[in-house]
Curated annotation (Swiss-Prot):
Its main location: cytoplasm. GO terms for molecular function: manganese ion binding; metalloaminopeptidase activity. The keyword Iron does not apply. It comes from the Bacteria. Its cofactor is Mn(2+). This is Probable cytosol aminopeptidase. It is found in: Cytoplasm. One of its GO terms (cellular component) is cytoplasm. Presumably involved in the processing and regular turnover of intracellular proteins. Catalyzes the removal of unsubstituted N-terminal amino acids from various peptides. It comes from Ralstonia nicotianae (strain ATCC BAA-1114 / GMI1000) (Ralstonia solanacearum). NCBIfam families: PRK00913.1-2, PRK00913.1-4, PRK00913.2-4. CDD domains: Peptidase_M17. Pfam families: Peptidase_M17 (PF00883), Peptidase_M17_N (PF02789).
Length: 506
């Protein structure tokens, strides 16, 4: 999909101007008001009052979530005109803007329109600028246009031939915003590319997306963007004494991998931001076996790994001026005659011992060794990303990512990035009292703390391995993928993480 930006002055958009431009569809937003402005007013003038008549008749009132598709409108070069309701102007928030974009895309999906002029970017949400409107439009349009099977046709012998979808989108902006809009469009495309990589990795079946596949993906990113990559195998992992990580790998024949991918866009002496992604490419639960129903979705248990690789790809494409390192411990969690058993005690890389009370609480075991490993980078901040607990879904559903952090500054920066990118999070507690639930009679700690506050105790477990740097934990179990008819990876939290890094880079 190709995006471009163009400065348009709708006051000068007569029959020989912008309205005369040829396209498959001209998309125009209309507020819930009798007053017309911008592209809507220009259209009304060019069509001798058509828009005003539609409003007066009640055929289109500009209400949120509504649209009206017009064909072969006299005085307009586009084959179609799509009017999109924006609701009340005073209530045109960032969420209302996103709803308008999605409303337009739903209407367009029922047409063969491929080349579109998109004017909604000249109506940014309240308290947002044109750059935000452009970046958000690009990411939402690309997100809606994602088709996994079209990207991986080898997985189906027979496919429906859609033959449709947007191909070219021209985003209109005011002249004063033209330069910022062009940059924003490029950044939106980079974020969309990162999200699509993340979604591809999550959606691939686990017999294809193995730990080795993830390692090769990191190598390809490094090759494409001239980054540094290192992949450690089992012997190197053993030499580092990552006993917790190795305990999870024991039941599988797939070799574990420990991936370190470096983007060096900042000064050499600048402390890096480290992103650590949980990479369980398939999670049976191990000896603490999961129920069979829905187990196929456990291929998504590596979405933390996928999201940090997708984020690093986006950062590299944008060329942000900061240093970022992605670290991915990746393996399968399988039962076998030599798999780790409930009650086994292992020694982590940190030297702390762990009683493995439940082998299905494996994500924290591979992460804790990775969190110890990253101390060597003397990081400015470490953010781990994991589909860690079902309990966070009970707490937050599928809307907000769970955000845990000791530092208010880091937590607030992540929450602000989530709000700005429409990839929202909600801060969860890390009170010291929760640590009591992790006590063990036979080791320094257990790997679970029981059902109460289970997402919190999982984060508290990780906190024990992060004392030497500023740290945050994102539990994406509720936001990384969807079930049911819309089953598939979402690409979250790539927008949140990328915006956080954009804000940090300045």
């Amino acid at each position: 999909m190709e995006f471009s930006t163009k400065a348009l002055d709708w006051a000068k958009a007569g029959p020989s101007g912008a309205l005369a431009a040829k396209s498959d569809c001209l998309v125009i937003g209309l507020f819930e008001s009798q007053t017309l402005a911008g592209a809507a007013k220009a259209l009304d003038v060019a069509t001798k009052g058509l828009v005003g008549r539609l409003v007066k008749l009640g055929d289109f009132e500009g209400k949120r979530g509504t649209s009206l598709l017009l064909h072969e409108v006299a005085g307009v070069g586009a084959a179609r005109v799509l009017l999109v309701g924006l609701g009340k102007e005073a209530e045109f928030t960032d969420r209302a803007y996103a709803e308008a974009v999605r409303t337009a895309l739903r209407a367009l999906s029922g047409t063969k329109a491929a080349n579109v002029t998109w004017t909604l970017t000249q109506q940014p949400a309240r308290d947002k600028d044109a750059a935000w409107a452009v970046l958000t439009a690009v990411t939402l349009i690309r997100e809606a246009g994602y088709r996994f099977i079209e990207r991986h046709p080898e997985l189906k012998s027979k496919r429906d031939k859609s033959g449709g979808g947007l191909r070219k989108v021209m985003l209109t902006v005011d002249a004063a915003d033209a330069k910022a809009a062009a940059v924003a469009a490029a950044r939106g495309a980079a974020i969309a590319n990162g999200m699509e990589l993340t979604r591809d990795l999550g959606n691939l079946p686990s017999n294809i997306c193995t730990p080795t596949y993830l390692a090769n993906t990191a190598r390809q990113i490094a090759k494409d963007f001239k980054l540094k990559v290192e992949v450690l195998g089992r012997k190197q992992i053993e030499a580092l004494k990552m006993g917790a990580f190795l305990a999870v790998t024991k039941g599988s024949q797939e070799p574990p991998q420990f991936i370190v991918l470096r983007y060096e866009g900042g000064p050499a002496k600048q402390a890096p931001v480290v992103l650590v992604g949980k990479g369980i490419t398939f999670d049976t639960g191990g000896i603490s076996l999961k129920p069979g129903e829905g187990m196929d979705e456990m291929k998504f248990d590596m979405c933390g790994a996928a999201s940090v690789l997708g984020t690093l790809r986006a950062v590299a494409e944008m060329g942000l001026k900061l240093n970022v390192i992605a670290v991915v411990p990746t393996c399968e969690n399988m039962p076998s005659g030599i798999a780790t058993k409930p009650g086994d005690v292992v020694t982590s890389m940190s030297g702390q011992t762990i009683e493995i009370l439940n082998t299905d609480a494996e994500g924290r075991l591979i992460l804790c060794d990775a969190l110890t490993y990253v101390e060597r980078f003397r990081p400015a901040a470490v953010i781990d990303v994991a589909t860690l607990t079902g309990a966070v879904i009970i707490a937050l559903g599928h809307i907000n990512t769970g955000v845990y952090a000791r530092s208010d500054a880091l937590a607030n920066a992540l929450l602000a990035a989530g709000k700005q990118s429409l990839d929202t999070g909600w801060r969860m507690p890390l009170d010291e009292e929760y640590q009591e639930l992790l006590k063990s009679n036979f080791a320094d700690m257990g790997n679970i703390g029981g059902r109460p506050a289970a997402s919190v105790t999982a984060a508290c477990f990780l906190a024990r391995f992060t004392e030497k740097y500023d740290w945050a934990h994102l539990d994406i179990a509720g936001t990384a993928w969807k079930s049911g008819a819309a089953k598939g990876a979402t690409g979250r939290p790539v927008p949140l993480l990328t915006r956080f890094l954009m804000d940090r880079a300045g």
